């Protein structure tokens, strides 16, 4: 039986280009360049011939185990109070359970991200494939793999931090003493080494982690550099600096899988999935008042990367839940057998239901129906019209106009409508009109969208969505704050206000977090 998902990428992890950190550390400039060229070729080969992008992935058994956890997962523990407002409107989901849904969609990181109106955005895949991007990616890779910018393989050493190596239990007030101890006692015999990192005199931590502010680290001065082996000083940018910081590491650490995140975090933006457990929470929370009917029908106008259909299948509602989704992306079409076609959404849902019911005496599954049409035209489909007036919830994360080029299909909304105004009237408005018309009274519509920078313009996606929905009689009830697991770059604190510089932020358990807004609307009784 054909599998429509990729599994753990053992081919890349076992490939000869998966060097250890010390091997990369000790490479000359030319050696590093050739290693990286070979790595790019290996990644493209894995992606194109085996359908495996540069992500680790889980095995089929691990996916089943993960999916089995979802139905009984206590998702309501994700809800938190925002300490800035006192409202319990923050969802902080740090679990990876359900993330295996990504493995049905290897084209996620082939999605181009547009920053201008020229539709010339690049994807992570482009950065591996295109020769003209070699120098850019080489520069980033030196930073991440040779200089370990994510601190994935080597750590700075704090002043008076206890170091346990072999039979030694020592601490140092300065880096020069550390170097003398390390070299005189041949500490490398215990499988450890260090490298010297250039630091600017005025470099100071400016992030949100209070524990890192004011921390002092072991540093060495110029006069001791000549006593340090060349292999440990290959990353020094300038020998004219007054001080250099020490980074210690253990031998034998492979660059991957840990290093795979570097491609997602730094090269360019990439498409992300909606967290399945967060979707499960929202389905359960906003349909709990639905009673006295045979099933709960939820509608997803942009099925995307499968996160919401998986969350729907895992939802634990008082009555069975039926998911209706639509998406025109033909990349998600698969052979259904017997000359028919199906979708990866169907395959994902069926796989989940099979895993959930495995070994269970009384099987119970939520159901689904998928349409491969744009949400602006799906109302013309006779089968979809059977849902008119019986939807119990509408919930999606729609396209941000042309910000993300999900595929090159002419049916994609950004291809059909080349300008924002035309897209708003030709896609956004009819999509919302259908959603409201087909929604029952006393029901909710959740809209995960945010204003997007596009060239010199800031697209008013939030206001336009709100204006259209309110013109259709929907009542705005507030915002659910979906906290992000990481805050790279955007977590900096404004020294004048003491607040994060991000547009949307909240505070949970004393920690600043960015969030994506999910706008909540209600359709009242007439």
How would you describe each model-predicted region?
Residues 1-68, 72, 82-128, 132-151, ...:
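Class I S-adenosyl-L-methionine-dependent methyltransferase catalytic core
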């Amino acid at each position: 039986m054909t599998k429509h998902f990729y599994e753990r990428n053992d081919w890349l992890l076992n490939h000869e280009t998966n060097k250890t950190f010390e091997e990369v550390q000790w490479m000359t400039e030319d050696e590093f360049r050739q290693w990286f060229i070979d790595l790019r070729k290996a990644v493209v080969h894995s992606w194109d011939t085996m359908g495996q992008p540069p992500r680790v992935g889980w095995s089929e058994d691990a996916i089943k185990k993960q999916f089995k956890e979802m139905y009984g997962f206590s998702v309501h523990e994700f809800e938190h109070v925002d300490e800035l407002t006192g409202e319990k409107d923050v969802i902080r989901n740090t679990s990876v359970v359900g993330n295996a849904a990504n493995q049905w969609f290897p084209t996620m990181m082939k999605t181009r991200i547009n920053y201008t109106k020229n539709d010339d955005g690049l994807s992570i895949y482009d950065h591996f494939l295109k020769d003209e991007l070699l120098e850019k990616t080489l520069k980033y890779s030196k930073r991440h793999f040779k200089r370990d910018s994510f601190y994935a393989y080597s750590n700075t050493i704090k002043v008076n931090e206890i170091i346990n190596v072999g039979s030694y239990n020592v601490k140092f007030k300065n880096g020069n003493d550390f170097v003398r101890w390390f070299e005189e006692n041949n500490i490398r015999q215990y499988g450890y080494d260090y490298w010297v990192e250039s630091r600017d005199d005025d470099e100071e931590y400016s992030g949100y982690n209070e524990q890192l502010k004011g921390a002092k680290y072991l540093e060495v001065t110029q006069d001791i550099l000549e006593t340090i082996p060349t292999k440990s000083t290959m990353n020094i940018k300038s020998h004219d600096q007054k001080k250099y910081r020490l980074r210690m590491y253990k031998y034998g650490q492979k660059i991957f899988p840990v290093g795979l995140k570097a491609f997602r975090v730094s090269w360019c933006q990439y498409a992300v999935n909606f967290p399945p457990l967060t979707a499960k929470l929202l389905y359960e929370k906003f349909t709990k008042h639905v009673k006295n009917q045979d099933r709960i029908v939820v509608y997803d106008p942009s099925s995307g990367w499968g996160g919401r259909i998986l969350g729907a299948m895992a939802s634990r509602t008082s009555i069975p839940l039926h998911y209706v989704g639509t998406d025109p992306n033909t990349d998600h079409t698969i052979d259904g057998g017997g000359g028919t076609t199906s979708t990866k959404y169907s395959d994902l849902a069926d796989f989940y239901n099979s895993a959930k019911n495995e070994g269970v005496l009384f099987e119970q599954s939520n159901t689904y129906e998928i349409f491969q049409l744009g949400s602006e035209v799906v109302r013309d489909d006779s089968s979809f019209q059977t849902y008119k007036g019986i939807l119990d919830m509408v919930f999606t994360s729609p396209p941000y106009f042309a910000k993300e080029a999900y595929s090159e299909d002419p049916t994609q909304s950004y291809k059909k409508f080349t300008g924002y105004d035309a897209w708003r009237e030709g896609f956004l408005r009819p999509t919302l009109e259908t959603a409201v018309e087909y929604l029952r009274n006393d029901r909710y519509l959740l809209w995960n969208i945010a204003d997007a920078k596009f060239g010199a313009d800031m697209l008013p996606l939030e206001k336009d969505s709100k204006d259209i929905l309110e013109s259709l009689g929907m009542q705005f009830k507030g915002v659910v704050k979906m906290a992000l697991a990481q805050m790279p770059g955007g977590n900096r604190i404004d020294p004048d206000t003491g607040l994060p510089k991000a547009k949307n932020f909240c505070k949970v358990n004393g920690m600043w977090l960015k969030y994506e807004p999910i706008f909540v609307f209600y359709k009242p009784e007439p």
